[in-house]
From Swiss-Prot:
<dbReference type="InterPro" id="IPR000719">
    <property type="entry name" value="Prot_kinase_dom"/>
</dbReference>
<feature type="domain" description="EF-hand 1">
    <location>
        <begin position="400"/>
        <end position="435"/>
    </location>
</feature>
<feature type="binding site">
    <location>
        <begin position="18"/>
        <end position="26"/>
    </location>
    <ligand>
        <name>ATP</name>
    </ligand>
</feature>
<feature type="binding site">
    <location>
        <position position="419"/>
    </location>
    <ligand>
        <name>Ca(2+) 1</name>
    </ligand>
</feature>
<keyword id="KW-0539">Nucleus</keyword>
<keyword id="KW-0536">Nodulation</keyword>
<feature type="active site" description="Proton acceptor">
    <location>
        <position position="171"/>
    </location>
</feature>
<feature type="binding site">
    <location>
        <position position="493"/>
    </location>
    <ligand>
        <name>Ca(2+) 3</name>
    </ligand>
</feature>
<protein>
    <recommendedName>
        <fullName>Calcium and calcium/calmodulin-dependent serine/threonine-protein kinase DMI-3</fullName>
        <ecNumber>2.7.11.17</ecNumber>
    </recommendedName>
</protein>
<feature type="binding site">
    <location>
        <position position="451"/>
    </location>
    <ligand>
        <name>Ca(2+) 2</name>
    </ligand>
</feature>
<feature type="binding site">
    <location>
        <position position="455"/>
    </location>
    <ligand>
        <name>Ca(2+) 2</name>
    </ligand>
</feature>
<dbReference type="GO" id="GO:0035556">
    <property type="term" value="P:intracellular signal transduction"/>
</dbReference>
<feature type="domain" description="EF-hand 3">
    <location>
        <begin position="478"/>
        <end position="513"/>
    </location>
</feature>
<keyword id="KW-0418">Kinase</keyword>
<keyword id="KW-0106">Calcium</keyword>
<feature type="modified residue" description="Phosphothreonine">
    <location>
        <position position="271"/>
    </location>
</feature>
<dbReference type="GO" id="GO:0005524">
    <property type="term" value="F:ATP binding"/>
</dbReference>
Length: 523
């Protein structure tokens, strides 16, 4: 089969969304030839890396890579992948290196196939359905150093394999470690190599995204990034596994950066008195500022504590698990918010939408009706097909907009999967309404308080941040940890949800933040 003849939809049934990143979306897929067979052996994760510009000659792939085969056939070459998105091309390069030098490995995500079309590149990956690392731990009845050592051993095993292939992950954190399945003895897989680099071959992706909690001192100081940078990140993960909080805690982001670069952390007696000395010694070696003095992944695999020989097999203080639960909830909320901000294109969509519908001005009750009709007509409540969107417009008697339905729909179908996010369309229409003051803030807030509970959940906060036009975000938004600071301003009592009073108070404390949020409902 020649280039350009294969289509993802010909071979896979693509279903629900498993997750979103700033530059990608991951969905569950089932191989069509196996739909009636054992689904457990035919289900995959399909990661679509969105391209910023269409290729003049998008290429398909000649055939599927047989599992275990070390051929590079099936990967678009750099000439064939004519895209401007550095992250897209970088991830393809790294995944090709993994296929050639690492796969299959019990602790590294496996890549089965690659497809390319005008919308982007689709990576067909091993499906990890066992949940994130911290989710599994906080749900356990018993948790001890032994369980933590098993986790570290598996991560070190995966890192040793990718490091041997000269790959630096550069974004190692709990959410990038998933269990393969729900079995108690399920292997833990390292995934998401979008920010990775191949030593002496590719340049590391420029910039730091999200929290700096796991970032090494050399990365913060823009020094040389090596495999030892991943070992620092593993040290941070281990510290959290044994205490329930990160090693570097500060009043603001600048102070935290300084603490990291100085390696300024401690083992507080109240928390760490029950933790073994070998565990603390291991953390200290991993969180050494000088990268050359940190142990390698290979050395870690022979460490007595990591092997379980010196890890305490007694249940940890329940307070540690409680803190870990709280930390995990906030981490997930921030991750969702950060991904949403980086995926934002609502500003450009709103300008195009306004050019289509002119001065059509929706009142607040019309926006509410639009939301209600979406939920009533759309099968999955949050996403609409074109025909469902047209039915919504008809039900609302918005007849003047029906001729533009397909064009409006196309603005919001960013990944060209034939569906659009209801909340993004709501926000787009709301942007045509010029509101001010508290009414404007309440409109922003209520638009995403979909269950009318009086507070915004983590998913709803993520949607709200997605609606912020990038052009209006603070100029320092790309600084490490800046997005964490913005969220901290909103969630004043750290309970993982934001009330309107908290939301409004954050706006009043920071006028620049208010300008950012209000920009999402102004033309």
């Amino acid at each position: 089969m020649g280039y350009g003849t294969r289509k993802l939809s010909d071979e896979y049934e693509v279903s629900e969304i498993l997750g979103r990143g700033g530059f990608s979306v991951v969905r569950k897929g089932t191989k069509k030839s196996s739909i009636e067979e054992e689904k457990s052996q035919s289900q995959v994760a399909i990661k679509t890396l969105r391209r910023l510009g269409a290729s003049n000659n998008p290429s398909g792939l000649p055939r599927k890579k047989d599992i275990g085969e070390k051929s590079t056939i099936g990967f678009p070459t750099m000439r064939q992948v004519s895209v401007s998105d550095t992250l897209l091309t970088n991830e393809i390069l790294v995944m090709r290196r993994i296929v050639e030098n690492v796969s299959p490995h019990p602790n590294v995500i496996d890549l089965y196939d690659v497809y390319e079309d005008t919308n982007g590149v689709h990576l067909v990956l091993e499906l990890c359905s066992g949940g994130e690392l911290f989710d599994r731990i906080v749900a356990q009845d018993k948790y001890s150093e032994t369980e933590a050592a098993t986790v570290v051993h598996q991560i070190a095993s995966g890192l040793e394999a990718v490091h041997r292939a000269n790959i630096v992950h550069r974004d190692l954190k709990p959410e990038n470690c998933l269990f393969l399945d729900v079995r108690k003895d399920s292997p833990l897989k390292i995934m998401d190599f979008g920010l990775s680099s191949v030593e002496e071959f590719t340049d590391p992706v420029v910039g730091l995204f999200g929290s700096i909690d796991y970032v090494s001192p050399e990365a913060l100081s823009q020094g040389k990034i090596t495999t030892k940078s991943d070992m620092w990140s593993l040290g941070v993960i281990l510290y959290i596994l044994l205490s329930g909080y990160p090693p570097f805690i500060a009043q603001n982001n600048r102070q935290k950066q300084q603490m990291i670069m100085n390696g300024n952390f401690s083992f507080y007696e109240k928390t760490w008195k029950g933790i073994s000395q070998p565990a603390k010694n291991l953390i200290s070696s991993l969180l050494t500022v000088d990268p050359s003095k940190r142990p390698s992944a290979l050395e870690l695999l022979s460490d007595p504590w990591v092997k379980g020989e010196k890890a305490k097999d007694v249940q940890m203080d329940p307070e540690i698990v409680s803190r870990l639960q709280s930390f995990n909830a906030r981490r997930k909320l921030r991750a969702a918010a950060i991904a949403s901000v980086w995926s934002s294109t609502i500003f450009l969509r709103t300008k195009k939408l306004k050019s289509l519908v002119g001065s059509y001005d929706l009142k607040e009750e019309e926006i509410e009706n639009l939301r209600m009709h979406f939920k009533k007509i759309c099968a999955d409540r949050d996403n609409a097909t074109l025909s469902e969107f047209e039915e919504v417009l008809k039900a609302m008697n918005m007849l003047s907009l029906i001729p533009f339905a397909s064009r409006i729909f196309d603005l919001f179908d960013n990944n060209r999967d034939g569906t659009v996010d209801m909340r993004e369309i709501l926000c787009g229409f709301s942007s045509l309404k010029n509101s001010k003051g508290e009414d404007a803030l309440r409109l922003c807030f209520q638009m995403y308080d979909t269950d009318r509970s009086g507070c915004i959940s983590k998913e709803e906060v993520a949607s709200m941040l997605r609606a912020l036009p990038y052009d209006c975000l603070p100029t320092d938004i790309t600084e490490p940890g800046k997005l964490d600071e913005i969220f901290d301003l909103m969630d004043a009592n750290n309970d993982g949800k934001v009330t309107f009073d908290e939301f409004k108070a954050a706006m009043q404390r920071d006028s620049s933040l208010q300008d950012v949020v209000l920009s999402s409902i102004r033309p």
